[in-house]
């Protein structure tokens, strides 16, 4: 087994968030940062902007991987997929505005390597974002399930139809306080549902200079995204989820005045309005490894790997972990194959001699098996 060293973790399709505790590899904490994009650029937001604490909302929604429970009778009970650890464990989730520029292109590319022009970020570069975050926690709701006692819930979220005043409506469009008569506006599969700081988004999105909202290049330079920071809660087993953050969105519902001038005259209306942001653009997944006794023992095993005769135990770990090398044909390379491909001759050719011999004899391998036993 050999260490991988830091690994590139930007712009992955699926990312990790949470804490995972393993009896062999120790504790891994996964954080995440992403850019945001306006769904509709250069929006008409209006004037006299308000976000009413009751009537309006600013929320973040990111769906989890899930499937319907076929054994349930209600038809809308879900089972979460890609969740590791104790699903009932809580985490201390903090969401901040990112202040670090997530570049598309590397400032120092190698002209001989086309791939070097794309910016690469690695799992151990959390400090870049941590030291540049805007130190105002955005998920500051009084509901601790959205911050200090966050957990990956399998519950659906249901949004009900409301009027301009945020009151529920029944099937006739009349105001109702009866929870049985209210009408469903939208159903959301299980996901991260976080109410964000309304005042902050009013001041920094709705009241931003129009030049910052005119296109997504300007917007991503102005508002550099969200940083999801994870902290462990004492006494918890830990839980980690795989998420497709690109399916997430921020929904801002507010009220404002918009003035329209026609040939008939000028009218100003104050109405409920909406603005949406997608969690799209550049991303980085950060991993931290707790330097405890378990982790140190794992590192010692890697330090003492025997590259000559091999090891009885092999350690395979993703992220900044370890890989396993299997040497099938030995390291001897004192011979090569003649021009006709019929005999071995003196001189190395960067191919193991045993493999050269198999090739010149034309032997075929019909079946080969490698059997690994996993230690519990």
Question: Model-found features: residue ranges?
Answer:
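Secreted, disulfide-rich extracellular signaling modules
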Residues: 1-376
């Amino acid at each position: 087994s050999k260490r991988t060293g830091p690994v590139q973790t930007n712009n992955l399709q699926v990312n990790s968030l949470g804490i995972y505790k393993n009896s062999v590899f120790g504790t891994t904490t996964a954080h995440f940062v992403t850019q945001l994009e306006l769904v509709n650029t250069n929006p008409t937001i209006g004037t006299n902007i308000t976000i009413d604490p009751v009537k309006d909302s600013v929320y973040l929604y990111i769906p989890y991987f899930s499937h319907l429970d076929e054994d349930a009778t209600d038809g809308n009970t879900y089972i979460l997929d890609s969740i590791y650890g104790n699903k009932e464990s809580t985490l201390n989730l903090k969401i901040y505005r990112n202040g670090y520029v997530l570049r598309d292109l590397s400032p120092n590319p190698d002209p001989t390597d086309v791939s070097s022009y794309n910016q690469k970020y690695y799992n151990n570069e959390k400090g870049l974002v941590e030291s540049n975050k805007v130190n105002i926690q955005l998920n500051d709701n009084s509901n601790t399930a959205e911050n200090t006692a966050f957990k990956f819930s399998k519950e659906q979220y249901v949004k009900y139809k409301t009027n301009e005043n945020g009151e529920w409506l029944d099937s006739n469009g009349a105001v109702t306080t009866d929870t049985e008569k209210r009408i469903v506006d939208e159903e959301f599969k299980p996901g991260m549902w976080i109410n964000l700081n309304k005042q902050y988004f009013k001041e920094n999105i709705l009241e931003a200079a129009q030049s910052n909202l005119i296109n997504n290049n300007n917007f991503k330079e102005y508002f550099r995204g969200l940083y999801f920071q994870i902290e462990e809660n004492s006494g918890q087993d830990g839980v980690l989820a795989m998420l497709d953050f690109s399916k997430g969105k921020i929904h801002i519902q507010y009220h404002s005045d918009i003035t329209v001038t026609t040939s008939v005259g000028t009218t100003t209306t104050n109405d409920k309005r909406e603005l949406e942001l997608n969690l799209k653009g550049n991303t980085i997944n950060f991993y931290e490894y707790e330097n405890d006794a378990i982790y140190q023992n794992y590192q010692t095993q890697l330090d003492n790997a025997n590259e000559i005769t091999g090891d009885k135990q092999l350690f395979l770990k993703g992220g900044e972990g370890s890989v396993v090398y299997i040497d099938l044909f030995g390291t001897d390379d004192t011979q090569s194959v003649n021009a006709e491909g019929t005999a071995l001759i003196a001189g190395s050719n960067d191919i193991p001699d045993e493999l050269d011999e198999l090739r010149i004899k034309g032997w075929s391998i019909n079946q080969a098996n490698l059997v690994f036993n996993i230690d519990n």
